[in-house]
């Protein structure tokens, strides 16, 4: 083997005798054990090792609306779960306070901000690092949103672009879905790198005013390409949205999204 490292799953955590032996506590969820092991594997791969991309680059779908409480996250998660029934999909949230730790009641050791530290690593090491932080809701893969929202603010636009592009190219996904917000720098740069953008609208004057201001700003900054990629969606009134994230594959919104996939994504 090119790389050698001993790992031992024991009933206690902490360092054990042996310089090259990594101790992993067995009294934790299987997915946490997997993530610790993949993290160790990533650390073993020499920095000079390069891997060739063996699959096509993922299509990047961005969701952004200047309107608040417009079901953007519900739309994004439903889209991700519906697409993941046939494709490999990764969902990334850029919300300041996503609240996923509480919603899913899961222990999270790595998040989106942690991946920024590994941007300069080789493609092979980065791909393993990505696996070590990625979790799942059903068949949908997701990177846990940042726990401290300040980490979203401090990262520069080019860093987010580089991270998303590296994930799309070397992550092995068919689609990467970006649930975007104003919490990040460089949102226009990220939108430019999307293959398709969905912007949810509403009919009331306040919402229409926000959309008009947003589109005018894009033109002022010469970002017409974002407008060209954007599909605006005025959603129908849904009688109910599932409370649990795992249930987003059912209901009226799920039916709406599946029709959208058939007409706009599969037909493209």
Give residue spans per PLM region.
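Phosphate-binding loop that captures ATP/GTP phosphates
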Residues: 86-142
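Extreme N-terminal, non-catalytic leader segments
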Residues: 10-60
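Cytosolic-facing regulatory segments adjacent to core modules
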Residues: 124-134, 144-180
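Conserved catalytic-core segment of NTP-binding enzymes
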Residues: 35, 161-252
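Short, small-residue-biased leader/transition segments that mark boundaries at the very start
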Residues: 3-9
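NTP-binding/hydrolysis catalytic cores, primarily Walker-type P-loop NTPases
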Residues: 246-268
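Walker A/P-loop phosphate-binding motif and the immediately C-terminal alpha-helix
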Residues: 55-96, 100
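Short, well-ordered alpha-helix to beta-strand connector turns
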Residues: 5, 18-21, 86-87, 137, ...
